[in-house]
Amino acid sequence: MTHSRAALVALLEEHGLTPSRALGQNFVVDANTVRRIARLSGVTAGDEVLEIGAGLGSLTLALVETGAHVTAMEVDRHLLGPLRAVLEPVGVSVHHADALVADYSAILTGPTTVVANLPYNVATPLVLHLLETQPLITRMLVMVQREVGERFAAHAGDEAYGAVSLRVQYYGDARVVGKVGPNVFVPRPKVESALVEIVRRARVRVDPAVVGEEELFTVVRTSFGQRRKMLRRSLHEWASEGVFERAGVDETRRPEELTLEEFARLAAAR
């Protein structure tokens, strides 16, 4: 049911389409890869699935094979005609929308899994936007540039660990569940991709009654503004007298060594 590489290339040629550099488009053209992504998404018959950036529908068709109820979103108006021609006969509704500003209340009707192949320039802001604003999205499987995926899933002490990792941890649990090479895309990217699963927590990881989100991430952002420096240097303008002692955090440590809970203690102790 999924597109073959030849069928996708023919579809592009038939409609006079070329992948948009401005939109960071790289279409997956390998049937085994899209079925693998659908399998890793964990969706089964009857589940609600939103695919963001449906492209030409190859991954969408693999998701349909699971028996899930699939809705597709695509920002590129040039793809809408061929995409709807492929998907509407198999019961998939296609929404023309920018995922960063879309009205999700018109799309989400219950707990939903998002599956998406995301371009580099959109991946981080979009994933954070969905975590922060769309509680009905309970799970995501996103394909992103490998470095971005490692950042999403990093923990204290990891090289990729930073403010983005902590923001993801605040809302959910992330892990890299697979890698995808460049040969399965048209056009072929210069980088490897990672498949990242993010499962939303039932409640945010730090109790807002203990420390507010804005206060917490102010200290996170300030610390990682000078990530290689000790906390006493990176936070010297932010920190009040005795804050490190009250928080039980050694001021000679570096931000990349601290857990989310330790940042929360700092924010609460200020």
Model segments located where?
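C-terminal lobe and adjacent flexible extensions of AdoMet/dcAdoMet transferase-like proteins
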Residues: 220-270
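Catalytic cores of RNA-modifying enzymes
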Residues: 1-222, 226, 245, 265-268
